[in-house]
């Protein structure tokens, strides 16, 4: 697929930054490209610790929320948590439950069933809690859009607290965007208007932790015990794909470090079941190995199983549960592969191929993997993609977007066709009647205003850098940039006029490109590209330009530099 190459052009005195912080000028440029301008921001990025995290008291309603909770705890009232079935909801629920238990609360929790309940708090779950004698409901990773549901709970005389991080819902009134929030007793969400909290990109678990931190302060609990929540916040922050900037970066760095010494039996058992070494866990392992196992419970079974794993104190029980989670994830992978292929074929062989916004209906597909498949479709065609499946009542869909297309806003414009919707600029969830799927698809495509430039993937190059400049010392410095993820992507470099000396497709599945390239100054380097997927390979003797990331390769005791090809084109 053709892509646009763009070089960041942000200006700064890179030499001075390098001298002040003891880093290479290339590092200084990368950091500036991540939007950091002041010395304070750069220091937080490179050296931030838990002491640099923002005060939870800055969150609107956070103190009010804890005042309500402590009053309920002292009065012996029942508190009920309603979470979510994804990794963020799982970790958020675990944090709230452990924290409230530590404060002496009579607390229980429920996670909505993805198939039966759908996303978030609903009347069925409210009735269930009410009939069990619940006085107070507290949500996590959901609730900000549950206006009617929370009104229903209030009419039953219940106290309701919302902790959430999702975008604030809105209506268009006379062309103006009007935000609306539920009439809860307290709402803790950094995205709220008039919330003075300086960072609005926390995940749900991050918001839940802020509440528990204040609760520990107010109840006089041992603050060192808060450390046991570190890895849960890190897992949720990585798994929910929020920006790894500001304090999210601290959360992940500290959480990964603490993971090596975690006392959480369930996490240890899951790491063991995934055949990983606990002292070598990176953000990659969380995002692509451990996280999917936790998520698989909410997709194919009940997310309660994952929470019970994270709460157990029995190692034998933990190992049993961890193996069950891994087995579920294998099943989830098989389903995903099958229906992703069907979705791609449907786009390629029908009128959908001409749409700018892809809406694919897979009636027989398990609704829990719709989001993953939407991501695959987006990756294949570079179009905003929504995969819709048949549900218990009508249809449900999950969408994944591209930069330049705010999926939540665009879906909101079609709100009259939907029964329920919510999400972010880059992802959304919907429910609608099956009969309205085609009308919804047409409305999205009629409303869209994406240019060809938006519909062409862009590769952003941090620094045009000759391969001759790269050495192991520089690559070692790049470790200071970790953890990588959304908002802090792995740095990308580019070089030109590289002569292809060798070029071959290797690997068991013949999907890896291995090249030997010669620079203009005669330096020979090894370059490799994974997941070829039928792409063209460069011809020997021709000159290419290459977008790359340099890595250290260790094999049979030999340490060498290997260039990972992100993209290439003939000169």
What is each stretch, according to the model?
Residues 1-4, 480-482:
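Catalytic domains of riboflavin
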Residues 2, 6-136, 156-157, 174-177, ...:
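Hydrophobic helix-and-loop "lid/oligomerization" segment in the mid-to-C-terminal part
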Residues 12-14, 116, 193-196, 468-470, ...:
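A short acidic, often aromatic-flanked loop/helix-cap motif at beta-alpha or helix-coil junctions
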Residues 71-75, 317-323, 327-361, 413-571:
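Mid-to-C-terminal polyanion-binding domains and interfaces
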Residues 127-205, 209-218, 228, 245:
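Active-site cavity-forming subdomains of large catalytic enzyme subunits
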Residues 148-152, 358, 373, 477:
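A short acidic, amphipathic alpha-helical/loop segment
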Residues 178-179, 184-187, 393-401, 524-527, ...:
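Short, well-ordered strand-loop elements centered on a beta-strand within folded domains, enriched
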Residues 206, 371, 375, 546:
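Short alpha-helical basic/polar micro-motif
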């Amino acid at each position: 697929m053709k892509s646009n190459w763009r070089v960041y052009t942000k200006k700064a005195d890179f030499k001075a930054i390098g001298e002040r912080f003891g880093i290479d000028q290339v590092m200084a440029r990368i950091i500036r490209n991540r939007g950091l301008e002041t010395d304070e921001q750069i220091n937080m990025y490179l050296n931030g610790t838990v002491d640099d995290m923002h005060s939870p008291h800055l969150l609107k309603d956070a103190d009010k929320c804890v005042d309500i909770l402590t009053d309920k705890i002292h009065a012996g009232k029942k508190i009920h948590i309603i979470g979510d079935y994804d990794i963020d909801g799982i970790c958020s629920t675990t944090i709230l439950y452990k924290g409230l238990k530590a404060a002496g609360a009579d607390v229980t929790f429920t996670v909505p069933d993805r198939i039966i309940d759908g996303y978030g708090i609903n009347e069925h779950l409210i009735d269930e809690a009410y009939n069990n004698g619940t006085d107070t409901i507290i949500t996590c990773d959901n609730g900000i859009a549950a206006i009617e549901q929370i009104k229903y709970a209030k009419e039953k005389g219940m106290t309701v607290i919302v902790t959430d991080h999702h975008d604030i819902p809105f209506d268009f009134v006379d062309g103006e965007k009007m935000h609306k929030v539920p009439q809860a007793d307290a709402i803790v969400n950094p995205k709220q208007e008039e919330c003075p909290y300086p960072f609005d990109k926390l995940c749900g678990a991050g918001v839940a932790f802020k509440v528990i931190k204040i609760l520990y302060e107010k109840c006089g609990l041992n603050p060192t015990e808060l450390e046991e929540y570190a890895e849960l916040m890190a897992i949720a922050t990585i798994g929910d794909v929020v920006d790894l900037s500001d304090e999210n970066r601290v959360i992940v760095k500290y959480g990964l470090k603490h993971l090596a010494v975690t006392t959480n039996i369930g996490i240890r058992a899951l790491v063991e079941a995934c055949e990983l070494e606990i002292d070598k866990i990176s953000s990659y392992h969380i995002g692509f190995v451990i996280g999917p196992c936790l998520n698989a419970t909410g997709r194919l079974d009940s997310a309660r199983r994952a929470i019970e794993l994270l709460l157990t104190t029995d190692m034998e029980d933990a190992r049993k549960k961890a193996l069950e989670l891994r087995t579920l994830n294998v099943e989830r992978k098989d389903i995903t592969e099958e229906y992703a292929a069907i979705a791609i074929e449907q786009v390629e062989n029908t009128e959908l191929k001409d749409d700018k916004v892809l809406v694919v209906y897979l009636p027989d597909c398990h609704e829990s993997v719709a989001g993953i498949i939407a991501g695959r479709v987006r990756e294949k065609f570079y179009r905003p993609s929504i995969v819709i499946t048949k549900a218990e009542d009508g249809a449900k869909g999950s969408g994944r977007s591209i930069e330049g297309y705010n999926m939540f806003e665009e879906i909101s414009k079609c709100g009259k066709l939907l029964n329920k919707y919510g999400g972010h600029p880059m992802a959304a969830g919907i429910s609608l009647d099956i009969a309205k799927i085609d009308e919804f698809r047409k409305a999205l495509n009629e409303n869209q205003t994406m240019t060809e430039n938006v519909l062409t993937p862009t590769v952003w190059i941090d620094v045009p850098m000759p391969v001759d400049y790269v050495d192991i010392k520089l690559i070692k410095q790049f470790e200071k940039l970790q953890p990588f993820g959304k908002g802090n992507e792995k740095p990308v470099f580019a070089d030109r006029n590289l002569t292809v000396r060798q070029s071959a497709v290797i690997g068991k599945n013949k999907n890896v490109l291995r090249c030997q390239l010669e620079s203009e100054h005669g330096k020979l380097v090894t370059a490799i590209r994974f997941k070829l997927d039928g792409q063209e390979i460069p011809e020997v003797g021709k000159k290419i330009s290459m977008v790359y990331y340099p890595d250290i390769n260790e094999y049979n005791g030999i340490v060498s530099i290997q260039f990972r090809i992100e993209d290439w084109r003939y000169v």
